Amino acid sequence: MMAPIMPRCMKRLLIVSDPPAAPGYLPRVRSLCEYFVQKGYEVTLLTEEYGDLAFAHSYPIETIRMYSGSTFDWFIKTVWTLLTDWHNRAFAKKAIYNLQSAISNYDLVLCSAFSDFPLGAARRIAKGLKMPLYCDIRDLDEQVEDSTYQYHHRTWWTMPFRRLYRAIHIRRRNKVLRAADAITTVSPWHVDFIRPFNPNVSVVYNGYDAAQFYPKNIKTNRFIITYIGSLFEWQKPALHKVQQIAQELGIAIDLHTPQNHPIAHDALGDAIRRSGIMLVLTSERTHGMLTTKFYEALGCEKPILCVPSDKGSLAELIAYTNAGIATDDVEYIKTFIRERFEEWQQNGFTRQATQHRESFAREAQYDQYYSTHI
């Protein structure tokens, strides 16, 4: 069954998301909002109040405060949410009250989320106002064993409750997935996982911002392998392997994580273009995790070394785009690094002969789906 095609007169979208927090400020959500604005839609982003919204935007943002800021308030409301889904219920109620008559003028609710919040709130808003609900699922608990990607930031004393929280969250999430009119998500693995709950699911890859991530030959006096992004426990074995190989070859690895040597968002493009190789770390324990840095390196046509191969969506995309290699084989890794080092010695830069690159620009990805479905 195909996803329902909305009338072409639809112009007013209420986009609901979790808070756009630093440092990235939810690039997928922001780019979706800007895409629809550029296409002539009236867009309002509805989200929870959480710090400063320190990014440029051409659409109104409505924020709702849910917590007072005290630890006690957070604890009580977290427990109450576990028992009653307070977070989603209260957010929806406040949203309808705050927006009042304006909220009924929207034609569709589009909710982008990585967790069960604000999926439940968006469902309540759409159901109460009799509007279609589209869900954009950025992450799933099941994509990493034990949900270590989802809950790595939780404090130590919450760990014993993680299994219970996860089970409740998944049940609430799946209830919304079944009710959605259409769903988009980030990889073929995610599509296959969601399809039993709702057949109207399609992949819209995260892609890259073509205005920031584009090919440009920049000569450097140093060949480096660059890693940019968060570093989780399940990625560290792969990192240690590459570090040992690079050390044997006398090549440096520059690590840029949110905690150590972070790179400002507007400087990411040049940082990638100055790299000899972009390192992507994954694990066979993960499913469908297509890191944004893969797309950004693809946009800049920089060679990608993915260690190990996830033997799934990421390895398939790297092969499809000829963006580099995905492997755990030490000799393949050494050969790949040596070849790129020799290319740098000859030219002063590296450049990957990619394929299908333009189709993974964000606007191209959004056009492929939303131009016919909204």
Where are these regions (language model features)?
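A charged, aromatic-enriched C-terminal amphipathic alpha-helix characteristic of glycosyltransferases
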Residues: D328-T335, E343-H373
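Carbohydrate-associated surface elements
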Residues: V186-W189, G207
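Acceptor-binding helix/loop patch of EC 2.4 sugar-transfer enzymes
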Residues: S68-L83, M131-I170
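Membrane-proximal helix-turn-helix segments that form the acceptor-binding/catalytic region
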Residues: A90-K93, F117, R124-G128, D139-V144, ...
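Nucleotide-sugar-dependent
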Residues: P23, W234-P237, A264-D270, M278-L298, ...
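Conserved catalytic-core segment of nucleotide-activated headgroup transferases in glycan assembly
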Residues: G207-H265
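Short N-terminal targeting/anchoring amphipathic segment
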Residues: Q100-P118, M131-Y134, R138
